[in-house]
């Protein structure tokens, strides 16, 4: 597992400690694991951890509904 993915899973585990299985394709928003407050918290944590700015146009379902979507977004914004 790459470093970005490990860090994202660690952040998600901090937000939702009750969830134990963070598969790459688990639907985070659709399944209710992340709600609007969780997404706001996640944005702050991702920004701080990866030293990135997440612009409003990146806050879309596709980027936040899976670990894989989050990894792709973080890698893209880190370039």
Put a short name on every predicted segment.
Residues 59, 64-77:
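C-terminal structural segments of small proteins and small subunits
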Residues 4, 24-25, 63-66:
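Short, conserved alpha-helical segments within structured domains
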Residues 1-21, 72-79:
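Thiotemplate assembly-line natural product biosynthesis machinery
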Residues 36:
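Catalytic nucleophile serine of serine hydrolases
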Residues 13-33, 51-60:
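Phosphopantetheine carrier-protein modules
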Residues 40:
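Conserved catalytic core of two-component sensor histidine kinases
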């Amino acid at each position: 597992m790459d470093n970005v993915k490990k860090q994202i899973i660690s952040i998600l585990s901090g937000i939702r400690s009750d969830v134990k299985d963070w598969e790459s394709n688990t639907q985070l928003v659709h399944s209710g694991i992340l709600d609007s407050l969780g997404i706001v918290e996640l944005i702050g944590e991702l920004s701080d951890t990866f030293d990135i700015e997440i612009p409003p146009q990146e806050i879309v379902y596709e980027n936040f509904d899976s670990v894989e979507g989050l990894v792709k977004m973080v890698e893209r914004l880190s370039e």
